[in-house]
From Swiss-Prot:
Amino acids binding ATP: D259, R266, R281, E311, F351, R428, K434
Family as reported in the entry's similarity comment: Belongs to the ATP-dependent DNA ligase family.
InterPro entries membership: ATP-dep_DNA_ligase, DNA_ligae_ATP-dep_bac/arc, DNA_ligase_ATP-dep, DNA_ligase_ATP-dep_C, DNA_ligase_ATP-dep_cent, DNA_ligase_ATP-dep_CS, DNA_ligase_ATP-dep_N, DNA_ligase_N_sf
Protein name, as recorded: DNA ligase
Cofactor: Mg(2+)
Keywords: ATP-binding, Cell cycle, Cell division, DNA damage, DNA recombination, DNA repair, DNA replication, Ligase, Magnesium, Metal-binding, Nucleotide-binding
General function of this protein: DNA ligase that seals nicks in double-stranded DNA during DNA replication, DNA recombination and DNA repair.
Organism: Metallosphaera sedula (strain ATCC 51363 / DSM 5348 / JCM 9185 / NBRC 15509 / TH2)
Catalytic activity field: ATP + (deoxyribonucleotide)n-3'-hydroxyl + 5'-phospho-(deoxyribonucleotide)m = (deoxyribonucleotide)n+m + AMP + diphosphate
Top-level class of the enzyme under EC nomenclature: ligase
Residues at the active site: K261 (n6-amp-lysine intermediate)
Enzyme Commission code: 6.5.1.1
One Pfam family this sequence matches: DNA_ligase_A_N
Amino acid sequence: MKFKLIAEYFDRLEKISSRIQLTSLLSDLFKNTEREVIDKVVYLIQGRLWPDFTGMPEIGMGEKFLIKAIAMAYGNKEEEVEKLYKNIGDLGEVAYSLRSKVKGVSILSFVGGNQEAGELDVMEVYNELVKIATSTGEGSRDIKIRIFAGLIKKATPIEAKYLVRFVEGRLRLGIGDATVLDALAITFGGSADYRPIVERAYNLRADLGDIARVIATEGIEKLKNISPTPGIPIRPMLAERLPDPEEIMEKMNGKALVDYKYDGERAQIHRKGDKVTIFSRRMENITDQYIDVTEYVKQFVKGDNFIVEGEIVPVDPESGEMRPFQELMHRRRKNNIAEAIKEYPVNLFLFDLMFFEGEDYTTKPLPERRAKLEEILASNDKVHIASHIIADRVDKLREYFYQAISEGAEGVMVKSIGPDSIYQAGSRGWLWIKLKRDYQSEMADTVDLVVVGAFYGKGKRGGKFSSLLMAAYNPEKDVFETVCKVASGFSDQELDEMQKKINELKREQKHPRVVSDMIPDVWVSPTLVAEVIGAEITISPLHTCCRGEKGGLSIRFPRFIRWRDDKSPEDATTNQEIMEMYSKQLKKIEEKPVDENI
Ligand SMILES: Nc1ncnc2c1ncn2[C@@H]1O[C@H](COP(=O)(O)OP(=O)(O)OP(=O)(O)O)[C@@H](O)[C@H]1O
């Protein structure tokens, strides 16, 4: 399959303005894709070479290298390329422009050998990109530059443009997983009605390329039988939230398992033979940060082929007490991880089992999963089952909640133990409900919102971005709906970081997956997630989240708390959750005694 075809689709995808068109064009691309390479094409359109969970390096070639490679490929001086870059501001366009100018020479002689421009094959491109990503050690910089220069030398202008953006890590077509799943269902199932089958398979085996390969080469029927596979992450099950224990017990039909809600890092742990791999909440491979945990798991969890889930929590080695989750940050260091492991010891608190020795446990009710988990865990002081009780009265739940908090937990997770209490991979539902200690403020909880636009500041901050247009995620439509403009809570350092982040992601037009009536100074590709707290949720004509007759919902007095790099935009707070928070808040106001309202 020719790479040229893909580059042309990239160009068309970038210009599209609606989500529906995006899906249909993507489906068109899949129809024209040779089935053997569809997995690679899926990775490429998402700007990567492989799924994050592989832990394999992505390219991320810096500007300087690219300038060198472009100059080398097209016979320009580096200063010329730099100058052009200053004028245009996009190295992809620079490559496009310089490649277009190489006209005097016939394409054949320019390209060299007997390969014509436009003849690049997808696998050839992919393999060369893999070489660039994986070459390390002395001299590797020069090798990378040479390989890339060779590649764009053979490319057409449009191929060169997208290759440059790809290796720079700026191919931001903003095609989320949901759009790919829709397009796969339409292309290979025949209609969007097949989406649930494709989605279920993806939830259990979160490798989009692999799912595309199975459906394209073996058909939709094959997807129905997919089960979790150690080594490939499962999309995590998520909890709903409620601030009131009474309501929670009602939702649970009067009886539930109540776990401590530990404040650490979620870990999905896979064992396949001798190999133990740990995936984060975002399904990134974090094994290297927790080599100690992999050893504990090998030692204390019986079996050779399983997937379990738990929370990694820093502990005081002397007292065994829980420590603040910030201590885990030290484990992110690239160097001296061994020291961080020694200095900041952790324990693992397991709360679920999804797969054991060939058997899919995700379809079994929670009591069965937990019983097996207890059975396979040997007694030890590093890996524990999450502290829990079975509560059948509201006061029991309340009491346990306070106990959890007093021991340093963040609250409790209340979990259904009914016959339908399966592990709902990849979805947020009422089978798990979180009750957290910070449900005291007016707006019950913080929200995680996606940056979709930015505004320049005035006065002291003139010329710099100082506020952000934020959106919630609407999973049904797979779009981002605006809910507030955040201008406070940033430290000076965070403001500086913000300039960099926005400059990398800004775009001229609104992204097709963004629904907004407000027009910011610059639009931003929906990629960054920030945690935000506000005073309350109100109806507003300005915002598009949950828009009804009276307007949309908006967060008043929003304040930035921190970036949530561990979340992808599709993990942001949903429109549905904002609606639920709003209804809760209304109910609270109605329930207040009259005199308090005066
Ligand atoms: N016993 C437990 N059962 C399930 N999850 C737990 C448990 N203890 C701690 N957790 C953690 O709680 C998280 C969910 O709650 P929280 O809202 O604090 O996190 P979040 O990442 O902001 O939200 P979410 O994961 O629901 O999107 C889980 O992702 C998991 O890491």
